[in-house]
Amino acid sequence: SAISSGWDKIQVVDYKQAQQYMDHIFLMSYDFKGAWSNDTLGHQAGLYAPAWNPKETYTTDFGVKYLLAQGVNPKKIVVGVAMYGRGWTGVNGYKDGNPFTGVATGPVKGTWQDGVVDYREIANEIAQGKWEYHYDKVAQAPYVFRKETGDLITYD
């Protein structure tokens, strides 16, 4: 079964009991943040909480630990990744050069839909110099940013 890494989703199911009926539990370690919120920006697929929000619970690490605390066999947990990014445009009002501390005006122009960008498109545009690449060493999460437009994409 594929499940969200969000603790609020995990808590409503007794996975210690449910695991007996499952070969694996595919933990979706993505879609933590996105353009559905323009005032709460963050990593779409952070492994750990970022330094600017150390109490963030929407992380892969938190999801795995939450399942283990329920008594799930670690051999049943398979961490899934997305091959796309989520992003915003018009990011402004941020502090210390960190766009995630600001707010956005809407979703970034996407590949399939606004706010969602295919990984290949991100990689190709990085190679063409269209993005400023960054890596959050604390959260273990990459992102790209264009200061001129406030376009921000977080991906895994």
Identify the meaning behind each predicted range.
Residues 1-7, 74-77:
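Short beta-strand/loop segments at the ligand-binding rim of alpha/beta enzyme cores
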Residues 2-6, 30, 82-86:
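Active-site beta-loop-alpha junctions enriched in small/polar residues
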Residues 6-18:
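Distinct, well-ordered alpha-helical segments
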Residues 15, 19-22, 57-64, 119:
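Extracytoplasmic/secreted envelope proteins and their assembly/folding machinery
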Residues 16-21, 70-74, 136-138:
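Extracellular/periplasmic catalytic domains that process cell-envelope and extracellular macromolecules
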Residues 25, 79:
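Conserved, mostly hydrophobic/aromatic
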Residues 33-46, 81-156:
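Glycan-binding loop/region signatures in secreted carbohydrate-active enzymes
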Residues 35-77:
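P-loop/Walker A phosphate-binding loop and immediately adjacent motor/lid segment at beta-alpha junctions
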